[in-house]
UniProtKB/Swiss-Prot annotation:
HAMAP family found in the cross-reference section: Asp_carb_tr
GO BP term, example: 'de novo' UMP biosynthetic process
InterPro entries recorded: Asp/Orn_carbamoyltranf_P-bd (IPR006132), Asp/Orn_carbamoylTrfase (IPR006130), Asp/Orn_carbamoylTrfase_sf (IPR036901), Asp_carbamoyltransf (IPR002082), Asp_carbamoyltransf_Asp/Orn-bd (IPR006131)
Organism (species): Mycobacteroides abscessus (strain ATCC 19977 / DSM 44196 / CCUG 20993 / CIP 104536 / JCM 13569 / NCTC 13031 / TMC 1543 / L948)
Superkingdom, natural source: Bacteria
Entry keyword Transferase: yes
Family: Belongs to the aspartate/ornithine carbamoyltransferase superfamily. ATCase family.
GO cellular component, one term: cytosol
Name of the protein this chain belongs to: Aspartate carbamoyltransferase catalytic subunit
Source taxonomy: Bacteria, Bacillati, Actinomycetota, Actinomycetes, Mycobacteriales
Protein EC: 2.1.3.2
SUPFAM superfamilies the record matches: Aspartate/ornithine carbamoyltransferase
Subunit structure: Heterododecamer (2C3:3R2) of six catalytic PyrB chains organized as two trimers (C3), and six regulatory PyrI chains organized as three dimers (R2).
UniProt key word Phosphoprotein: no
Keywords: Pyrimidine biosynthesis, Transferase
Amino acid sequence: MRHLLSAADLTRDEATAILDDADRFLQALAGREVKKLPTLRGRTIITMFYENSTRTRVSFEVAGKWMSADVINVSASGSSVAKGESLRDTALTLRAIGADALIVRHPASGVAAQLAQWTAEGEGGPAVVNAGDGTHEHPTQALLDALTIRQRLGSLEGRRVVIVGDILHSRVARSNALLLNTFGAEVVLVAPPTLLPVGVGTWPVTVTHDLDAELPGADAVLMLRVQAERMTGGFFPSAREYSVLYGMSEARQRLLPEHAVVLHPGPMLRGMEIASAVADSSQSGVLQQVSNGVHIRMAVLFHLLVGSSDSPEAVPA
């Protein structure tokens, strides 16, 4: 695996190996007073975040540091981009400095793939990880969601996963639809017609607008935030009406099977797409997702920079 740009880049075997190694990292670090492994000692990881982020940015930094890598953060405001330098020149500069991996988040779709192309000119070049590109994809989020479902339910094959909310602006929805399909899960999208993207009919999903009808048969429900910062018009009449039709209330939670897990990629708008009582309930996997984010990103960096778990620097058993 050279880069991770899309959930579609992963075969089922590759994705399973990443989930398995994430679990192994979790076990290797459990109970350690000092969370440190030598796996990536001497490697340099540079994070390039051109959009605000808490969970993804911090978990990538923690993942690298827990594996003894040198992790450097480059932001738009603190780099020469603020002086007018192009993203291409920034990327080539970081390659010349000796970066082993570039973790990029950017408001424009396709930037991660472009970065991989620019830095691959000639021989070598850093591994590139897409940490979210516009409304396109967020593959490591899909991996950690899949890991959380697998930990809760034991398997992904044949599971019914319902993704609810602002599908139109969600890179998480697209990556989850692709990855869960790879794992053999059934994916159902629930959203108002105004929040569904053009071309959603080509995705490996079922689309509906009736949330209540889908909950009794759901094994997992992924609630999405309404991304008001990406909206230029009125996509629904009001926040209250949206919450009534598409929010995960306590009443809706009671429609779920007892084994079902409720997920949210964050940040959550409590009281809009999810009630606080649901987010904090025993069926919620929200904090488990956050924890899994570190271990998944450790596993991704391991596979990109070291190789398979059969290599000499394998994940600790």
